From Swiss-Prot:
<protein>
    <recommendedName>
        <fullName>Secreted RxLR effector protein 51</fullName>
    </recommendedName>
</protein>
<feature type="short sequence motif" description="RxLR-dEER">
    <location>
        <begin position="38"/>
        <end position="53"/>
    </location>
</feature>
<keyword id="KW-0964">Secreted</keyword>
<keyword id="KW-0732">Signal</keyword>
<dbReference type="GO" id="GO:0042025">
    <property type="term" value="C:host cell nucleus"/>
</dbReference>
<dbReference type="GO" id="GO:0005576">
    <property type="term" value="C:extracellular region"/>
</dbReference>
<feature type="signal peptide">
    <location>
        <begin position="1"/>
        <end position="19"/>
    </location>
</feature>
<keyword id="KW-0325">Glycoprotein</keyword>
<comment type="function">
    <text>Secreted effector that completely suppresses the host cell death induced by cell death-inducing proteins.</text>
</comment>
<comment type="similarity">
    <text>Belongs to the RxLR effector family.</text>
</comment>
<keyword id="KW-1048">Host nucleus</keyword>
<feature type="glycosylation site" description="N-linked (GlcNAc...) asparagine">
    <location>
        <position position="101"/>
    </location>
</feature>
<keyword id="KW-0843">Virulence</keyword>
Amino acid sequence: MRSSTILFVLGVAMVAVNGVTTALISDGTGKGTQGKHRLLRSNSGKHKTDEERLKLSARIYGTKAYKKRQVRNRESARKFQKALLNMADGNDIARLLKKRNTTLKGLFALLARNKAGLPKEAKNHITTVYNTRRGGVL
């Protein structure tokens, strides 16, 4: 064999070994257990499309922050419900509000359906609260 052929074969072998080593390291097989877990965690948050992002929900329902938000929402719904009961004396909405113990979202849905029976200042109050809390228009 010629020396140029030997050098060429050695060069190809070195490139192949280098490629295999790089592939093993990037797959995590050459790393320890901690490195593999870190690699898995770093790749688990990457989603290619919006559909994949929607399938994996980002909410963690067991956290303290989520529970605090739920309690605050229930408390504000109760306060809002009491304020509406004081405004609406003896009409159909007052009876509906007394029957239900709803969340803030359910309360807004109820009011959106039955807003016609309230006095004018109550309608304005509902609209301003809805716009500031939800960013929408009734």
